[in-house]
Amino acid sequence: PSLAAHFLILAALYYYIRGRREGRCFFPGLLALNCLTIAVHPYFVPMTYALTAALALECAAVSRKPLPCLGSVAGNLVGTVAVGWLFGLFTGSASGGSEVEYGYFGMNLNALWNPTSRWNTLWSRVLPVQNQTGGNYDAFNYLGLAMLLVGAALLLWSAVHWRQTLALLRRHWALVLVCLCLTVFAVSNVVTANGATLFTLPLPHALVRLATTFRSSGRLFWPVYYLIFLSCLVFLLRRLPSVHWAALGLAVLAAVQLWDISPALLTRS
């Protein structure tokens, strides 16, 4: 149940957006969030800290005052480690009782449009289930039909207006960087597409052991997933002429999304 606490990721995204708008990298709420994260589930720690680091790096670049931003991240780390120590997370064995190493639970390259998860649950009325390998099921990241349609429109718009897209990416360069890092870690050194393993990148054994701390690596794509989701929503809402049209657009979007994923909702209910 603790892995369902995705509000932690959304809250970290909120502080990133707010921090960029206000030009500040330290928030007491963000410190509390990072401390809470390690108490809820350690898997969320690299996710919220990726967004915390992105905010600090971009604020440091804009203000040209890196020390306050580095101090902010250091303060967050000290608080998080203290809470983890109080909860006993740094004592005893780190083994979860499984011999599976990093790479087995990597994210398949079809994850965003593959509507199947653990126990072969069907998540779409429209899109067919595609093959997976190994533990790809643990990296479930299906966007849903409505978001895939809006996402396709967003990609097309971004390609046509590529100068605006590049300017936006440059403005949020650290966020792009941490998203790339999270995606690479989620895919892992065992790169899979549909039912095939495309290649396995050999890594030093010590690095594999370290990465195995988060062996269910596909979960680390969740911040990128929510960023894609929110980007699609913003793209749609900004192209509707009024609040009334925006409300109607959201209603249609939600209806299509719920209709598409209803098989899984009915199964799980």
Give residue ranges: language-model regions.
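Membrane-interface helix-loop junctions at the exits of transmembrane helices
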Residues: 1, 84-93, 111, 115-124, ...
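Perimembrane helix-loop-helix junctions
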Residues: 16, 46-77, 154-165
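Signature aromatic-anchored transmembrane alpha helix within multi-pass, membrane-resident enzymes
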Residues: 74-78, 180, 230, 236-266
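Transmembrane helices and adjacent periplasmic/lumenal helix-loop junctions
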Residues: 28, 32-58, 78-86
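Membrane-interface transmembrane helices that cradle and orient dolichyl/undecaprenyl
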Residues: 10-27, 37
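Periplasmic/ER-lumenal interhelical loops and adjacent helix-loop junctions
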Residues: 83-158
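Hydrophobic alpha-helical membrane-interfacial segments at the cytosolic entry of transmembrane helices
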Residues: 64-89, 99-104, 108, 172-181, ...
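Membrane-interface micro-motifs in multi-pass membrane enzymes
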Residues: 1-13, 39-43, 141-143, 200-227
